[in-house]
Amino acid sequence: LFRSRENQSKAYYKEFLKLQAERYYPSTLTLQMYMLFATHLNIGTPETLDLFRSFAEDIKQYPKYDGTRIVWVHLLPFYQETLKHYFNLNRDYQIQCTEMNLDYMDELDTTHPLEALATKMLNNLYNGPYEKKANMVVKLAKEMHADGVINFCHWGCKQSAGGVFQLRETLKAADIPLLVLDGDAMDRRNSHDGQIKTRLEAFLEILDKERNSSC
């Protein structure tokens, strides 16, 4: 039953993401981070199933989106003032999803639960070469019709910093713009707002110009 609810939850989440590729849906940096509880720690519970079901139904009430779409990679510094200004409940700029919530979306074999969990662990996005993650980000950006990708390199995280070059080259080959931000996702004392503000606004300006020129 638990694994069955997990499959149902993921089905609703996929339905939600398919709709969000074209629609506006209010969100915040904090909500995107808290989704990790639903997609990982609490996946399979009745409450999480209700949550994803409500997402899939609720988004149908929202209008088509004509702003700038962003796919976020790795952690979100939810306290950062500039990022909050641009991505918290903003109709012009929308973070559609983060790859951390989509590290394994295949359906589980409920008739063989232990084998299903083993497969889930072995085939997880973070198990294996970084190339797997880079290719997944490209696929996700295309599916979400993203205008660009932002990768946040959390200080001390070798995985996020070490794979940036490969991610950049993979996205470049797919003609998808990438912004790499460095900082501390947890400790606001290590946040350099001036640098983040300058680089983010320049990146968003480029995306806006490209999107407007293609309209």
For the regions a language model picked out, list residue spans one by one:
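Polar low-complexity intrinsically disordered regions
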Residues: 1, 214-215
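A charged, amphipathic alpha-helical module
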Residues: 2-99, 104-107
